[in-house]
Every structure is written in C-alpha cells, then in structure tokens.
Amino acid sequence: MKKTQQKEIENVTNITGVRQIELWRRDDLQHPRLDEVAEEVPVALVYNGISHVVMMASPKDLEYFALGFSLSEGIIESPRDIFGMDVVPSCNGLEVQIELSSRRFMGLKERRRALAGRTGCGVCGVEQLNDIGKPVQPLPFTQMFDLNKLDDALRHLNDFQPVGQLTGCTHAAAWMLPSGELVGGHEDVGRHVALDKLLGRRSQEGESWQQGAVLVSSRASYEMVQKSAMCGVEILFAVSAATTLAVEVAERCNLTLVGFCKPGRATVYTHPQRLSN
C-alpha cells in the first residue's frame, strides 16, 4: 500500500464510527489481518426521562438524528419544542436525553399508552395498522427540478460517506440544490437514521425545503417517503427502487418520488410535473 493511501486510511479511522478488528480473507485463512469495520450501537431516545425507542445507528451526529426523528415521527412540530438535549453513554449503548415542552410530552405519553402491551415494533411510532401510510398534509407544488442536474450529484454522493468508503457499510442522505450541488450530507449504518440526521440538521439550521430535493443512496421505503413528507420535502431521489407502499404514500401526499437513479437514468414513480429534462 502506498504511504499516501495508508495516511488517508489512518485519517478516516480516527473519526467516530469506525473501528479496526481482526479478520481473515478467503484466500488466506491462516493469517489474520486488521481491517476497518463500521460501528453500530444501540441508541435510545429518552424524552423527559422516559425511553421511547431504541434504534441501531452509527455513533455520530446523534443530536441531528434525535431532532430529525422527533420531527419526522410527528413528536414535535419544530426544533423549538425541544428545550435541551444531551448524549450520554449507557451500559449497552448511548442515550440521547431530550427535554420536550410540556405540551409535546403530553402528546407523546398518549401515543405511548396506545403502545402498551406490544411485544414488538415493525414500524417505529405506529400504534395500529390503520396508521401505516396515513397521509400527511398534502405538499405544495413550489418548484421545478432539472433531471440533467442529477448526474453530477450522483457522482458526488459518495463524498459524504467517509466511513462508507472505508467499510462499504453505510447509507447516505444529502440535500441537493437545483444546481445539482450536494450540501449537508450525512451517513449512517441505517438508511432511516441517515435521513433523520439530514432532516434534523437542516431543520436546526432553519433551511428551506422548497428549493431542492433529498437524495439517498438506498431504496425508497414507505418510511423514507413518510419522513420526507412530514418535514416538507417535495422531491425524493433514491439510488435503488421504491416499494409499492412508498409509491402509494408519495402519490397521496404529492411527493415526487424517483428511483433507480443512475447517471443518465431515473424512474419517476409519482408527480412528474415537478421535473424537466
């Protein structure tokens, strides 16, 4: 390995979210070697002293994650509903301790009562089947997006995945300006968490959702669409495919959903009127 390449790897392994472990290659099972692996830790979101959910995530940018999750799951309406936040270690992972306004905490407790007695959670924040795909307020049609700008953005999405470049184990979510420039990207071992981090950061910074789109390196599931729409995102681009429920929810809430995004290629599932070529 060249010295410059070794230096680059050392720089990346010093960031949060990567750890070296001993492993063996198929062609040399007799001699172990060190390699970089993405960290995955349990992260509990604790609201006013009550644990609400535990998610598996990369251990960085957790304040953005907690804010984005709180917004995209409808726990809060704006960052002002959170009075304070601390990330603290626990016995088996990390806790994000969040201080909610009294009004929002009362609403959360009502939701938790409906969750009482369940032994598992397939979709976090959902109490009953009727809430799956429940439409959010329909999104406005405020912008046009030139699909020709997508190609350059796709080439640069990997720039927001330093851990992913080293380990091959993260998803990315980034905000794409109408010019095709990517800003405010985040990565995580979980695709939903990467998106929540992006939503949280832009909301914290007071950025508008009307001039641009979200680009994710993963498939577009129902939750990715629902989270985006809850925060006011009008256009969601995904590198992989969309699910049927994602398409149904996007159609109902007026979100433009585009999948199979590759240079020179894209599949538009819903509301193509926001797009030009």
From Swiss-Prot:
Gene3D superfamilies: 3.10.20.10, Cytidine Deaminase, domain 2. Keywords: Cytoplasm, Molybdenum cofactor biosynthesis. Its main location: cytoplasm. Required for formate dehydrogenase (FDH) activity. Acts as a sulfur carrier protein that transfers sulfur from IscS to the molybdenum cofactor prior to its insertion into FDH. The active site is at residue 121. HAMAP family: FdhD. InterPro entries: Cytidine_deaminase-like, FdhD. Belongs to the FdhD family. GO terms for molecular function: sulfur carrier activity; sulfurtransferase activity. The gene is fdhD. This is Sulfur carrier protein FdhD. Pfam families: FdhD-NarQ. One of its GO terms (biological process) is Mo-molybdopterin cofactor biosynthetic process. GO terms for cellular component: cytoplasm. It is found in: Cytoplasm.
